[in-house]
């Protein structure tokens, strides 16, 4: 960790000394996650999207098997979401374009397994169809406030979780459709919300849009 401009060979560059201290403190508190992140960023530089996603999932599975993740799960307790009546992704053919809307507005469109699967199914269908533009946005007050913490740790083991991530993932389909895709961000874009937007060739952000990666 270093202040920006002082040491280009470092893994993390902060804007000022206070930022560098905060980064160093976070790395000290979570050394496994910090080290794995640095290794992942080094290894994935210059890789294809597919290779980068595979490396990321493998790194995440490693952390899921470690003590830091176990302590986090024990500390947060278990959450249960009520069954949702509305589809997690809305799909509309608007003639000149396709319009996909993340549809969990009460939860700021936190990405659940059901939403992920619906998004993958929609994107797969659009990839097989014509080449009209695609707009992706979110219902309610936010675009996407990240993965749903109620589902974190629900998969039986890290190996199974890795297989799920690498077989049911919207990212490869968004990468394939990137030139057709516009993501419209309003309100919060956190974690997975930032990642979804990053795969689009065009991102439109409203004045109230905020972007945050809690892992960094």
Predicted regions mapped to residue ranges:
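Glycine- (often His-adjacent) and acidic-residue-rich active-site loop
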Residues: 138-172
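Short, active-site-adjacent cap segments at secondary-structure transitions
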Residues: 38-39, 141-145, 190
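Hydrophobic/aromatic residues within transmembrane alpha-helices
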Residues: 37, 136, 196-198
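C-terminal alpha-helix plus adjacent terminal tail
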Residues: 1-98
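Glycine-rich beta-to-alpha active-site loop
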Residues: 1-17, 170-216
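Charged catalytic carboxylate motif
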Residues: 36, 114, 118, 166, ...
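Hydrophobic helix-cap positions at the C-terminus of alpha-helices
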Residues: 27, 126, 174-177
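Conserved CoA-thioester-binding segment of acyl-CoA-metabolizing enzymes
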Residues: 71-139
